[in-house]
From Swiss-Prot:
Descriptive protein name: Probable peptidylglycine alpha-hydroxylating monooxygenase 1
Pfam families: Cu2_monoox_C (PF03712), Cu2_monooxygen (PF01082)
Organism: Caenorhabditis elegans
Binding residue positions for Cu cation B: H207, H209, M284
Catalytic activity: a [peptide]-C-terminal glycine + 2 L-ascorbate + O2 = a [peptide]-C-terminal (2S)-2-hydroxyglycine + 2 monodehydro-L-ascorbate radical + H2O
Signal peptide: 1-22
Physiological role: Monooxygenase that catalyzes an essential reaction in C-terminal alpha-amidation of peptides. Produces an unstable peptidyl(2-hydroxyglycine) intermediate. C-terminal amidation of peptides such as neuropeptides is essential for full biological activity.
GO BP term (any one): peptide metabolic process
Compartmental location: Secreted
EC number of this enzyme: 1.14.17.3
Glycosylation sites: N182
Keywords: Copper, Disulfide bond, Glycoprotein, Metal-binding, Monooxygenase, Oxidoreductase, Secreted, Signal
Cofactor note: Binds 2 copper ions per subunit.
Cofactor(s) this protein requires: Cu(2+)
Length: 324
């Protein structure tokens, strides 16, 4: 069972105050000793002063944390200092368990495999605190391996109280599904943009576990003859550092009526079927799009499909001219 070394209330208060007044602040695990394949969350309540997050740096290594996710929440999933937020893995009966967010979750940032720091483009920021829907930051750390010593994995966040003219958000395209034994399979998802926004994608990130070979994201526009026109957002080997990298076309825009899609190529050389899930023995198919808007960002930033074998672009989404 993980053991927790709690910070004092004075230390927490000092940290919360520094978040409002400093240009760089940290959110860290308070000395946890995790078991293998554990997902742990800790949260920070934001002040009434609006802030704009403009940069992120992981304070860990891939040998310690498998990945780190930073969520913006209206309310955290728990009032505990640290809690088990691995909703898809086996629960620990002796540890408080809850989702990452109690309401209105929004993925802000993701890190894995020794990815370098990320600085957002000039004049772009994630709006948090104040009158925004994000009243708390929640950091989720996936520890793939158990640890013997207390761990303080965290994130260094660059922020400013100066309003940024372009608001940032992160969209996640993700699938479920099953990867059959001794087979290479394609996992696909596609969603129509239904909200009245103009998205300017500037960075993308891919994530799978060890069976991932390639992950790509595409913008699809349909013409009056119902012919689909595909434009690459980004394509990457998920075994490389899982950093946010620039999109292929920085002038690209995604608008109401367009379709965003993602595809993961996974290769299974094992004599067992592999399900999509949270543990080291499962797989994942994730494609993140970081974008900015001149006005409000989208309310729904998740695109999900059940994945293979139940979902295919040509069959369920009725897409044509699909790239290889």
């Amino acid at each position: 069972m993980p053991r927790f070394y709690l910070l004092s209330s004075c230390a927490l208060l000092a940290f919360a105050t520094s978040f409002c007044n400093a240009e760089k602040s940290q959110i860290r695990m308070p000395g946890v000793v995790p078991e293998a394949d554990s997902y742990l969350c800790t949260s920070l309540e934001l002040s009434d002063q609006e802030n704009y997050l403009t940069g992120f740096k992981a304070l860990t290594t891939k040998g310690t944390a498998h990945h780190i996710l930073l969520f913006g929440c209206e309310e955290p999933g728990s009032d505990e200092l640290v809690w088990d937020c691995g909703e898809m893995n086996k629960p620990d009966d002796e540890m408080p368990r809850a989702p990452t967010c109690g309401s209105k979750p929004a993925i802000l940032y993701a890190w894995a495999l020794d990815a370098p720091p990320l600085e957002l483009p000039q004049d772009v920021g994630f709006r948090v605190g104040g009158d925004s829907n994000i009243r708390h930051l929640v950091m989720q750390v996936h520890y793939m391996h158990s640890k013997q010593e207390p761990d303080e994995t965290g994130l260094e966040i660059t922020h400013t109280e100066e309003p940024q003219p372009k608001l940032a958000a992160t969209m996640l395209l993700v699938t479920g599904g099953t990867l059959p034994r001794n087979k290479t399979e394609s996992f696909e998802t596609a969603c129509m943009i239904e909200e009245d926004v103009v998205m300017h994608p500037f960075a993308y990130r891919t994530h799978t576990h060890r069976h991932g070979k390639e992950v790509s994201g595409w913008l699809v526009k349909e013409d009056q003859k119902h012919e689909d026109h595909w434009k690459l957002i980004g394509r990457r080997d998920p075994q490389l550092a899982q950093m946010f990298v620039p999109v292929e076309d920085q002038a690209m825009t995604i608008q109401q009526g367009d379709m965003v899609t993602a595809r993961c190529i996974l290769q299974n050389n094992e004599n067992r079927d592999i399900s999509m899930g949270a543990t080291e023995e499962d797989e994942m198919c994730n494609f993140y799009i970081m974008y900015w808007t001149d006005g409000e960002v989208m309310q729904d930033n998740t695109c999900y499909s059940p994945g293979a074998p139940d979902y295919k672009w040509a069959r369920e989404a009725d897409l044509n001219h699909i790239p290889k």
